[in-house]
């Protein structure tokens, strides 16, 4: 039985997060899991999409959620649900539970296919963002399995963080922060890194090829 080298912990000022329970080496796989819920909504379409364009996708997401067993629904609803004055403004037909689900999905989803499908994961969706990450993630399209791998050494007790927008290019730090704040509904407090450690890791590990060799 493999014991994960990470655990969910309370993080001051962030709520929950993932912390190393032992020292982690660069390139080490720390987590692999399947999603609780998959939808065709991304953070951007959830908040800024036209009502007619996103209404069907929202209904499908709610239906998929309703088809989960109660234990899975409870895990989904336990994820962070940010308060937002514009939450679900394009979907007044939704009840409070559905609006909460939409906020959870917008804030916690992880991309599976490039701008096609996103998933909520029991553990990985609690990993916090950093513009200077020490890990990266990648979901495999064929089975939606997600792998999280370190891109530098991580000390015991240190938080494992990823860059939610590692593949996006932003001309300025302000544009990057605006996108994060608008889509993920939290204030990014990190500065633009001078060296993208995870981009280096992707090159070293053959464009995530090692994710599927464990």
Predicted regions and their residues:
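Intrinsic disorder
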Residues: 14, 18, 24, 114-117, ...
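Compositionally biased, low-complexity repeat tracts
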Residues: 9-13, 23, 91, 115, ...
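Catalytic cores of histone-lysine modification enzymes
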Residues: 32, 36-137
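Generic secondary-structure boundary/loop-capping signal
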Residues: 3-5, 15-16, 117-118, 124, ...
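Glycine-centered secondary-structure boundary/capping sites
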Residues: 5, 41, 69, 179-186
């Amino acid at each position: 039985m493999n014991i994960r080298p990470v655990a969910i912990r309370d993080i001051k000022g962030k709520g929950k997060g993932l912390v190393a329970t032992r020292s982690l080496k660069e390139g080490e796989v720390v987590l692999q899991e399947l999603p609780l819920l998959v939808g065709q909504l991304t953070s951007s379409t959830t908040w800024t999409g036209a009502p007619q364009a996103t209404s069907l996708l929202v209904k499908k997401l709610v239906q998929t959620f309703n088809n989960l067993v109660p234990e899975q629904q409870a895990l989904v609803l336990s994820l962070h649900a940010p308060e937002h004055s514009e939450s679900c403004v394009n979907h007044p037909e939704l009840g409070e539970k559905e609006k909460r689900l939409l906020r959870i999905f917008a804030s916690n989803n992880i991309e599976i296919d490039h701008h096609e499908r996103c998933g909520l994961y029991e553990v990985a969706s609690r990993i916090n963002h950093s513009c200077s990450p020490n890990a990266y993630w990648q979901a495999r399209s064929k089975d939606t399995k997600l792998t999280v791998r370190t891109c530098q050494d991580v000390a015991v007790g240190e938080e494992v963080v990823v860059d939610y927008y590692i593949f996006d290019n932003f001309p300025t730090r302000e544009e990057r922060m605006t996108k994060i704040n608008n889509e993920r509904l939290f204030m990014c407090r990190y500065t633009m890194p001078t060296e993208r450690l995870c981009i280096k890791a992707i090159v070293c590990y053959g464009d995530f090829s090692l994710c599927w060799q464990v």
